[in-house]
Amino acid sequence: MLLQSQTMGVSHSFTPKGITIPQREKPGHMYQNEDYLQNGLPTETTVLGTVQILCCLLISSLGAILVFAPYPSHFNPAISTTLMSGYPFLGALCFGITGSLSIISGKQSTKPFDLSSLTSNAVSSVTAGAGLFLLADSMVALRTASQHCGSEMDYLSSLPYSEYYYPIYEIKDCLLTSVSLTGVLVVMLIFTVLELLLAAYSSVFWWKQLYSNNPGSSFSSTQSQDHIQQVKKSSSRSWI
């Protein structure tokens, strides 16, 4: 009578004489996870990391524009909230580090790298949420400051020789500055929302990668290899 036992893709046939002959099965469903780790995982993490690094570069560049661009003093309260918080630079640096870790973790999928990616993405989610609040507050303050241009123009236009005290080009410059600053904040807001979504998705992704995707599979694979070696040794002894 022929008895069969299967262990991790290897079957062992026991003949009537007690000789064990290991037989390897054809690759099946058990190798799909390994194929994903080798092909799908690096591609997905590289895309996520690259977009996060792009968000880092754009947000930091726009922050530098806000620092060095000249604008009227009554716009300072609207912009200083975001700049003094350090979000355009520290937050962008956090996004860049997170993206770099995601790319590295995809190419070298080990538990320490996966845990680092999970932690950094969680921190990036909180940072992006705080940045979203700061940018929204700055946009509201900027809208209030922009109304100052129109109200001051109406007041000075009622005075005699108003063109002498407040030339028309200064009014246009005030409005143009308001539009430019609003555009910069809107673009920063868009990429902050994008980073928030990416960081939240990546946090869930790395959480599943760590705890939901066959935990302890590497340990089981090691046990399987040790068992195969023992079976081969017992088989050779039986032949002798």
UniProtKB/Swiss-Prot annotation:
Swiss-Prot/TrEMBL GO biological process terms: cell surface receptor signaling pathway
Name used for this protein in its record: Membrane-spanning 4-domains subfamily A member 7
Membrane topology: Multi-pass membrane protein
Gene Ontology cellular component list: plasma membrane; trans-Golgi network
Record topological domains on the Cytoplasmic side: 1-47, 105-121, 200-240
A Pfam family matched in the record: CD20
Family designation: Belongs to the MS4A family.
Domain of life: Eukaryota
Expressing tissues: Ubiquitous expression in normal tissues. Expression is more elevated in adult liver, lung, spleen, and heart than in their fetal counterparts, and is higher in normal tissues than in the cancerous tissue or cell lines. Low levels of expression were detected in the promonocytic stage, whereas high levels of expression were detected in mature monocytes.
Disordered, as annotated region: 218-240
InterPro entries assigned to the protein according to its UniProt record, in alphabetical order: CD20-like, MS4A
Role according to the record: May be involved in signal transduction as a component of a multimeric receptor complex.
Segments crossing the lipid bilayer: 48-68, 84-104, 122-142, 179-199
Main location: membrane
Localization of this protein: Membrane
Topology feature Extracellular, residues: 69-83, 143-178
Alphabetized UniProt keyword annotations: Membrane, Receptor, Transmembrane, Transmembrane helix
